């Protein structure tokens, strides 16, 4: 009898910083889609952030590892750092598929990504290699293009937390408590991240 395909959720992003909405999205996908694991993939050089200040890969990786600590079914992959250059999903997925041939990949995205899909590199090719899965985000357009009609929607809570807002709160001296794992909050404070941008 052939071995069942492993079901892996992929959650890519800048994670600057990782926050509770990322973790809730991942856990919801794990439970609702009956996935084996969630692999978090921090972008090495995010192409959509060119010209913006982004924390070092080392800081973002450290925060992500702290954020998922304690959940054995959450893993962090550094594949985009190993690949080098700009981090394009269309280039990362074939590498993962070669390394893990008996795996069904689910690409996890917030509905806020729908507005940006046209700027992705070869988006239709991306979603031919992985099942698109969308999580609801507050105040975002949720109309799918026809080539994405096979997408799955999660029934996740709509948490209004964004990394942009978290960085602004830190810069303004406001609390980020309960919006981010405590370990990540302590790391941000210890390293003095986001005080100036």
Predicted regions and their residues:
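Nucleotidyltransferase catalytic core that binds NTPs
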Residues: 1-197
């Amino acid at each position: 009898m052939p071995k069942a395909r492993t079901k892996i959720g992929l959650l890519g992003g800048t994670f600057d910083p990782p926050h509770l909405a990322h973790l809730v999205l991942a856990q919801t996908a794990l439970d609702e889609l009956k996935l084996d694991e969630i692999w978090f993939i921090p972008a090495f050089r995010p192409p959509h952030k060119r010209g913006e200040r982004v924390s070092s890969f080392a800081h973002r990786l450290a925060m992500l590892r702290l954020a998922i600590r304690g959940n054995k079914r959450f893993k962090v992959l550094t594949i985009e750092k190993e690949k080098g250059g700009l981090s394009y999903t269309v280039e990362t997925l074939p590498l993962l598929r070669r390394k893990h041939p008996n795996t069904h990949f689910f690409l996890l995205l917030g509905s806020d990504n729908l507005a940006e899909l046209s700027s992705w590199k070869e988006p239709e090719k991306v979603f031919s290699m992985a099942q698109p899965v969308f999580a609801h985000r507050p105040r975002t357009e949720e109309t799918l293009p026809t080539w994405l009609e096979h997408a799955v929607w999660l029934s996740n809570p709509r948490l209004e937390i964004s990394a942009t807002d978290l960085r602004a709160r830190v810069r303004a001296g406001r609390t980020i408590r309960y919006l981010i794992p405590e370990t990540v909050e302590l790391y941000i404070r210890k390293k003095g991240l986001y005080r100036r941008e």
